[in-house]
Amino acid sequence: MTNEKRLLRARGICVIIPTFNNEKTIGEVVKETLCFCDDVIVVNDGCTDSTAQIIGEIDNITVVAYSQNRGKGYALQQGFRKALSMGFAYAITLDADGQHKPEDIPLFLKANQEHPGALIIGARPLQGVERSKGSDFANQFSNFWFFVQTGKRLEDTQTGYRLYPLHKLHGLSLLTNRYEAELELVVFASWH
């Protein structure tokens, strides 16, 4: 076990990976994540492709699964509940599509050591990345809506690469179950 893995475990940090039909990427994402953290929870959000089989073949992970797709927000809530029941204090979330780099997990550890109890949001490199106009608009609108709700500015409210202090989420009931739940979580954290 590496020193960083020991520090993650000592601080009670796990990684949660929600997935819906990511058969092309999930195996590699989970295996790369295991190189940086031994405590990985994968939430199978009603996958209908071979994702369940792929994650079932990976040792040393915890899988939460249910048959009907309920949305990313619901999957995150299930992952948070599982992490809390396992005694974790924090959860790093990353997407199963490969857009987040597991090698950045130590950066979350460092930020958590410097700012314990804070929600840490990883910033994606948005400049020079080819994205659809719809995706670009959605992110800009989400950033604007966050500002309206909180008076604070964030460059990328849509990134799923975050570290959550789980005690602050205990008992939280989200209004939404899909992708917008991530914005709801950031607004909630800003208010508290």
Locations of the language-model features?
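N-proximal low-complexity "stem/linker" segments adjacent to membrane-targeting elements
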Residues: 1-32
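Short, conserved active-site loop motifs that form the nucleotide-linked donor/cofactor pocket
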Residues: 13, 61-62, 117
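Short beta-strand/loop segment that forms part of the nucleotide-sugar
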Residues: 30, 38-47, 64, 94
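Acceptor/aglycone-binding surface of glycosyltransferases and processive sugar-polymer synthases
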Residues: 68-85, 90, 102-179
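Acidic donor-binding loop at a coil-to-helix junction in glycosyltransferase catalytic cores
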Residues: 180-185
